[in-house]
Amino acid sequence: MRLDRIIAVRNDKTVYKDGNRCLKVFRSGYSKADVLSEALNQARAEEAGIPVPKIREIAVIDGKWTIVSDYVTGKTLARLMVEEKEKKKEYTELFAELQIGLFSKKCPLLTNLRDKMRRKIAETGLDKELCNRLYERLEALPEHDKLCHGDFDPSNVILTDEGTPCILDWAHATIGNASADVAQTYLLFRLKGDIPGAESYLKLFCQKTGTAREYVEKWMPIVAACRMAKCNEKERGFLYSWVNAPDEY
């Protein structure tokens, strides 16, 4: 095994290039069940006809669980949006269209989003009254069966050297309401401080699907609470401001 270079470093994983393979090496002690779940989600996405890196094996390297997949050559949309600022609107439109395309795919065996949200709200450490209010909001919103990526961010979409998209990181994939996934992506833009990008993205999604912005906004307090289950202190303050949005929001 020859690890050419580190591609990315996260709190719980390091991603390496190894020739024509990509190795996602999880930290020691990382849940085996979570690793296998992520790999299974990605395999199901592939079987649904979604462009994803093909998984080649699940391995243990130096005692650490590792997902081995094809290495995809290209640049992320996040990088392209920075390098080619004059084309940011074009890339944002492509990004929105890719997500809309995901919503048309069927992956019935994925985790139910509503069930996952209930669990995440319980893990936030928020007071009981606020949690109950979030549960009530969640129950009042429609339950759908759309494929939701759960972490759909420009950094998780590669535009290959051939000009085709490839979607990464399927750890949080579920089936549920598409507008919840859109609310998640909107907040990801906002967490990075890209308010114009967030607004442009949401406007494009609403225009292309005929979805009212107000409907997407109803999901934002719930999505923000779910992200609070695993976030740093800086993010927590920002997310809490969304969780505490008025009930009529």
Which residue stretches match the model-derived regions?
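Structural motif at the C-terminus of the N-lobe alphaC helix and the adjacent alphaC-beta4 loop
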Residues: 40-51, 102
